[in-house]
Amino acid sequence: MKPVIETHALCKSYHSRPVVDHLNLTVPEGCVYGFLGPNGAGKSTTMKMLLGLVHPTGGSVELLGHTLNEANRIALLRQTGSLIESPSGYLHLTARENLSIVADLKDVDRKDISRVLEIVHLTKDADRKVGQYSLGMKQRLGIAMALLGSPKLLILDEPTNGLDPAGIQEMRSLIAVSYTHLT
């Protein structure tokens, strides 16, 4: 299996304090990986570097067989779905309208919106304003945004953050179902 993510001596420091220190990571295609560690260990920073949202202090990132750089970042991100820390969306718009914006940004056919709404069980609430959603519904909308366009790579940072035990179990099941839709 070829790797979908590779890092080589990846580093990030803030004010001379190393947060990520020479990380070498290989994630093969078709695998599910997770980062575990205490707050401040660099998990979110690593994921942001994988997406080109934070520039590393040193080292390199390869996504889908290409070294991540400014010239190819947008093209690689169009093949990647992500949810970093907490879902973002326009609260005054409906879920369907939010997904339409993301579809346009990712250059994805809007017909895919119905598919991802069904996967995350938001079809019946698709035309409600996101500001009326519970935290769990917002998390599911974030997963739907990440799944638009059937990405080759899915990066989720704390997708169960702030959920109660039932919500955590629901999100884990949703992630497992989402994974089967990627492979």
Ranges and model annotations:
Residues 180-183:
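Conserved small/polar residues in nucleotide/adenosyl-binding loops
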